[in-house]
Amino acid sequence: MQTLYLDAFSGISGDMFLGALLDLGLDFEQLKTELAKLHVHGYELTQQREAQSSIYGTSFDVQVAGGKDHGFVEHHHHQHEAGHHHDHEARHLADIEALIDGSDLSDTVKHHAKAIFMEIAQAEAAVHHMPLAEVHFHEVGALDSIVDIVGCCIGLELMQIDTIMASPLSDGSGFINVAHGQMPVPVPAVMQMRVGSAIPIQQRLDVHTELITPTGMGLVKTLVREFGPLPENAVPTRVGYGFGKRDTGGFNALRAVLFEKKKLSQQIVNRTADAVLMIEANLDDQTGEGLGYVMNQLLTAGAYDVFFTPIQMKKDRPATKLTVLGNVNDKDLLTKLILQETTTIGVRYQTWQRTIMQRHFLTVATPYGDVQVKVATYQDIEKKMPEYADCAQLAQQFHIPFRTVYQAALVAVDQLDEEA
């Protein structure tokens, strides 16, 4: 069995996922043979090896006979798949589950495909405030999207991939145009699927369109159980790129990496040291509300940390020292924010070297629900810390002490270690 890492620096969609698997070596003819077990007809699959920004990858597409370009429609499930064609047939969740159950696909593929559709259906039901049974899959229920989702599950089985990890996902910002007006990014179904999941998502303010489709988010939420950078003990064996079809103004691809893990003692551990920028300013006439606002603005802009220290200035004035830690490349951005949002007329800079533990996330199942756990490593040192937000949410939901959920998460992590 193999481990797959998804580097979603430009988001994720169904066709990008399949394109990446094909670029990694998934047999196209085998994929078509397995998809025929759905017992549906009237579609054609295409793959094309091409280059974006001089980097070669694979584009995957589904075309439905007699269909037309759907462009941007109500639920907007396929921003990345803007070239797909279908007949706009609407299906309910029960119709899709019956189609999958009636196929000759393996039980594993059926289970995963139905779970993905369930995630999307639950999100749509919440967004549109309707019973789950009444949700219409105006797009994901269409044939091309069924092929996307089932095809991804088939591809993972054919390639014997049993473990999937992912980077933090990237999404765009602003608004997109749909049949009934404008929709914010992340789109509502994607945002709804984030509820209770702790899937890390960063918004790119330089991209004014959708990067994560509900199909892509459904795939990630159902199949990915660990988030973070590529493990430091990973030895990549193959890299593939699946291209999206949206013009994002940049390199629009999902990078997929097949890798093997080696023991940390077998390799030199790198990337434990880097430089961090520290910016300081003394403020003796800034309101408390203003301080809170600038902290939020700086953190939103990418600062690593922001904190305040009470100080005594000349003429015995009580004041506040603002300290901002951030990336050295963000010096101008953070400086402009400080000068714009505070009363200071100058700032101080220092660059510090630091040693950091490598971090990644995994999800563990507790009796109360899933909890994200941060795993930090440095040489032979390892620390595991359940995420506060997950534990707090479950403690409130079940009216139990926070510590009870926290300890349950630690027990679940220990069980994973024993199984490994």
UniProtKB/Swiss-Prot annotation:
The keyword DNA damage does not apply. Its EC number is 4.99.1.12. One of its GO terms (molecular function) is lyase activity. Keywords: Lyase, Nickel. One of its GO terms (biological process) is viral translational frameshifting. Induction: Induced by L-lactate and repressed by D-lactate. Is thus regulated by the L-lactate/D-lactate ratio. Makes part of the lar operon (larABCDE). It catalyses: Ni(II)-pyridinium-3,5-bisthiocarboxylate mononucleotide = pyridinium-3,5-bisthiocarboxylate mononucleotide + Ni(2+). NCBIfam families: nickel pincer cofactor biosynthesis protein LarC. Belongs to the LarC family. This is Pyridinium-3,5-bisthiocarboxylic acid mononucleotide nickel insertion protein. It comes from Lactiplantibacillus plantarum (strain ATCC BAA-793 / NCIMB 8826 / WCFS1).
